[in-house]
C-alpha cells in the first residue's frame, strides 16, 4: 500500500448490536481507530491516553450526525518507511488534516500538498502555492514521527526479504 488516496481510501463495513443497517458516513477512520472503538462498544471506559493514536467511532456508528473522532493525535498520519514497488515506489509519510494532505518522500524530502475536498485524485500539487499550509503540516508530521520513534528509511531497504532490525532505524 501507499499513502495516496487509492491506497488508503477504502470502504469499511461493520455490523453489530445497536448499529443500524445501511448507514453511511464520510468521516475517515484508520486501523488505529479499531481497538478504541471495539473497547468502547464492549463497555470499556478507561482512557487509553496517548499510547493509542486512534479514537472510538462508536458515536458515528450509533448517531449519523456525529462528525468527529477524538484521537490522541491531530490529523491522520500514514508512514511507509520503505520502497514498496507500488504506486509511489519510494519511502514516504503523509498527514491529512481537515481538507489538506501532505506527502513527504524520505529519499529527497520532496513534498506534495493536495486539497482533498477539491482534488481527490491528487493531480494538483499545491506545494508551491500554499507554503504556510505546507510548512505547518510538515512540522506536525515530523514532530509525530520523532515522538513515536517511527522507523526511518535507509537506502536499499525494501519491504521484502529484510530482517525487521534492518528496517527499524528510528527517527
Descriptions of predicted regions:
Residues 1-19, 30, 170-171:
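Histidine-centered active-site microenvironments of extracellular/periplasmic hydrolases
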Residues 2-3, 20-21, 27, 32-35, ...:
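C-terminal cap/loop subdomain of S1 sulfatases and analogous C-terminal strand-loop tails that border
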Residues 12-13, 49, 60, 155, ...:
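Residues at secondary-structure transition points
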Residues 15-16, 78-80, 153:
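Tryptophan-centered motif/residue detector
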Residues 22-23, 69-72, 123, 153-156:
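Short, hydrophobic secondary-structure boundary micro-motifs
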Residues 34, 108-110, 116, 121-171:
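Long, internal low-complexity/basic segments
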Amino acid at each position: 500500500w501507499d499513502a495516496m488516496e487509492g491506497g488508503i481510501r477504502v470502504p469499511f463495513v461493520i455490523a453489530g448490536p445497536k448499529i443500524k443497517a445501511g448507514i453511511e458516513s464520510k468521516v475517515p477512520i484508520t486501523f488505529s481507530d479499531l481497538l478504541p472503538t471495539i473497547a468502547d462498544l464492549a463497555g470499556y471506559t478507561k482512557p487509553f491516553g496517548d499510547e493509542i493514536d486512534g479514537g472510538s467511532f462508536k458515536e458515528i456508528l450509533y448517531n449519523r450526525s456525529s462528525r468527529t473522532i477524538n484521537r490522541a493525535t491531530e490529523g491522520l498520519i500514514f508512514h511507509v518507511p520503505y520502497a514498496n514497488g507500488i504506486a509511489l515506489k519510494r519511502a514516504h509519510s503523509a498527514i491529512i488534516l481537515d481538507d489538506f494532505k501532505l506527502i513527504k518522500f524520505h529519499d529527497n524530502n520532496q513534498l506534495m500538498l493536495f486539497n482533498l475536498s477539491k482534488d481527490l485524485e491528487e493531480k494538483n500539487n499545491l506545494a508551491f502555492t500554499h507554503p504556510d499550509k505546507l510548512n505547518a503540516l510538515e512540522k506536525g508530521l515530523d514532530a509525530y514521527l520523532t515522538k513515536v520513534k517511527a522507523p526511518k528509511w535507509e537506502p536499499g531497504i525494501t519491504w521484502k526479504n529484510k530482517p525487521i532490525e534492518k528496517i527499524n532505524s528510528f527517527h
